């Protein structure tokens, strides 16, 4: 996982590893794999569902720790004795791709404690209405395969086959244009 390129010193000291993968207005995403590997030496032997359950346990513990710290934050930083700040674990994601702010894809395996198998894509170019549908469907399928752990050779083969298909004389050129 590639982490944020530059991190303020007060979040992560220089030389320390920053496990924060993505942050926006109301969300924080962290690479929990190093912590899971540290806590569970048999991590590689666990099946995916067991890994998700262990991750959820850790996320819920940190959720409570952070929520408890919000009382101190409210009192000391905002001079507010009573507050409604709360940290909430919304979902467990097995893998994700973060391109930039509000442009990402994530494979959600648990949402608010309920088992899911959901691909959540936000803001990526191929999802836009003016993007040729033939490319949108292809990019969506490649992204899903990448997030679900397909081997590089499998993805490379699909890319080459798609290129061959797009370059063939049998393809109607109008499907390559923008729909608007």
Predicted regions and their residues:
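DNA-dependent DNA polymerase catalytic subunits
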Residues: 1-23, 32-180
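Catalytic core of nucleotidyl cyclases, primarily class III adenylyl/guanylyl cyclases
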Residues: 29
């Amino acid at each position: 996982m590639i982490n944020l390129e530059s991190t303020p010193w007060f979040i992560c000291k220089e030389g320390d590893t920053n496990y924060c993968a993505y942050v926006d207005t109301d969300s924080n995403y962290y690479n929990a794999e190093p912590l899971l590997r540290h806590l569970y030496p048999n991590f590689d032997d666990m099946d995916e569902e067991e890994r998700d359950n262990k991750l959820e346990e850790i996320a819920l513990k940190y959720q409570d720790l952070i929520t408890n710290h919000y009382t101190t934050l409210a009192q000391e930083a905002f001079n507010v004795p009573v507050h409604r700040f709360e940290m909430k674990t919304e979902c467990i994601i097995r893998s994700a791709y973060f391109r930039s702010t509000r442009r990402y894809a994530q494979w959600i395996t648990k949402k608010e404690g309920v088992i899911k198998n959901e691909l959540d894509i936000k803001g990526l170019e191929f999802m836009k209405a003016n993007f040729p549908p033939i490319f949108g469907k292809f990019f969506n399928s490649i992204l899903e395969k990448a997030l679900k752990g397909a081997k590089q050779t499998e993805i490379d083969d699909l890319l080459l086959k798609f290129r061959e298909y797009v370059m063939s004389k049998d393809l109607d050129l109008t499907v390559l244009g923008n729909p608007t």
